[in-house]
């Protein structure tokens, strides 16, 4: 990072690789990015390779992908149980930031309450399960990481959505929280169904 970014080099001054036990990477599946276009097989192959390479936070790092971008966390409404906007076209993905700017409920993540995060985590579990297994429902903690890994989500996105010119909307931030914290956090998240 220091080699490519002067600001990062300054902030990381005095730190060595051994000072970091875990590395998490967040990446937007940005269909309008000309370097890694969602419609270009080479671009999507690169993302698949990245997921294979960055699959462990204690080694090279763990990669999480937002579909289509980090703003997906804003694209929620508490009264919508079965997610009203499941996907966007790859053409719309480039304008997605503007599309969700009108959503008022989850605009400022700094103001999210515990109940908000509980709802967002529940939604993310159900959405990920819907993308991978076609079922909008929660799964056990074990199943979450056995069947709904970042690689599973990516492959299902390619097969079921991108191949049809769409991308299923999913924020990886709640999935990261569920994986980062132990199973007791998962149990607390699911103890009160908000949807």
Please provide the spans of the model-predicted regions.
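C-terminal accessory helical subdomains adjacent to catalytic cores in phosphodiester-
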Residues: 7-195
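Domain-level signal for Mg2+-assisted phosphodiester chemistry and nucleotide/NA-binding surfaces
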Residues: 1-6
